């Protein structure tokens, strides 16, 4: 289990925490957010939209889809509304296993488990599906003979594919292991290939050349390739802020909000 926290390097989880207004972060993390703010002043809203997408997706899965077991890859630091809280509010018996190997997250992982005895944390590398799927706590907690939900929210855009495997390959390995009737939710930075592409590339440049060093904006086709063999839930791949919003839109979208998409699919 990772134990050393290098505070001189930015962490994905802590940068996210910074943008959400949290306190579990360090100067290197705050530097990334400040640099992003210079090219996209609305970066905090970008992050809030992503968290809201996670909550709406989880409510859909626990409510209408009837899912009561969740594998959440890249859990991040505990915040106001975590997956287990959103799921168990609708389905108290729901079991949630969080996966993350960020040392900061591992150090705080216990906080995610204090709520109840149906929430678990596994320090594993989400880019290694077999490491995750074969973990004893995962196999003991989740019943792979019944439908479950796999969440890959805000994770794969931090993988640059230089390791030889594509994001699509990684997701295919996860999806192959899921039973029929399972759901997959994914969110990702988008290069919209329109007037907002320049902003996407400026944000990508900041991510890649900041203390964080990762954050790739991919096209719709590249992102959809990460959902092989799944039946997409309406409205398909959509801006996170527009995926079944809580109400009518009263203000125009900010440019950065048009560079973050999410999708949910069901395995036949």
Predicted regions and their residues:
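Conserved beta-strand signature within the Rossmann-like core of class I S-adenosyl-L-methionine
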Residues: 148-152, 170-189
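Conserved Class I S-adenosyl-L-methionine
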Residues: 198-221
């Amino acid at each position: 289990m990772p134990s050393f926290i290098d505070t001189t390097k930015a962490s994905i989880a802590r940068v996210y925490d910074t943008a959400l207004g949290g306190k579990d972060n360090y100067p290197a993390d705050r530097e990334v957010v400040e640099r992003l703010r210079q090219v996209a002043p609305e970066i905090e809203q970008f992050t809030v939209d992503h968290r809201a997408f996670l909550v709406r997706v989880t409510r859909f899965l626990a409510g209408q889809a009837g899912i009561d077991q969740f594998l959440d890859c890249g859990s991040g630091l505990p915040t106001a509304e975590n997956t287990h809280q959103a799921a168990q509010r609708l389905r108290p018996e729901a079991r949630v296993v969080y996966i993350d190997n960020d040392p900061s997250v591992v150090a705080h992982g216990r906080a995610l488990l204090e709520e109840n005895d149906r929430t678990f944390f596994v320090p594993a590398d989400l880019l290694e599906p077999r490491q995750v799927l074969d973990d004893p706590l995962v196999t003991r907690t989740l019943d792979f003979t019944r439908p479950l939900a796999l969440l890959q929210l805000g994770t794969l855009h931090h993988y640059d594919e230089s390791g030889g495997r594509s994001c699509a390959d990684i997701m295919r390995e996860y999806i192959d292991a899921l039973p029929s009737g399972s759901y997959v939710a994914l969110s990702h930075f988008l290069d919209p290939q329109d007037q907002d592409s320049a902003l996407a590339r400026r944000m990508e440049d900041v991510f890649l050349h900041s203390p964080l060093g990762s954050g790739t904006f991919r096209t719709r086709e590249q992102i959809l390739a990460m959902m092989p063999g799944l039946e997409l839930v309406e409205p398909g791949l959509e801006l996170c802020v527009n995926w079944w919003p809580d109400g009518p839109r009263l203000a125009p979208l900010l440019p950065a909000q048009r560079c973050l998409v999410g999708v949910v699919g069901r395995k036949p």
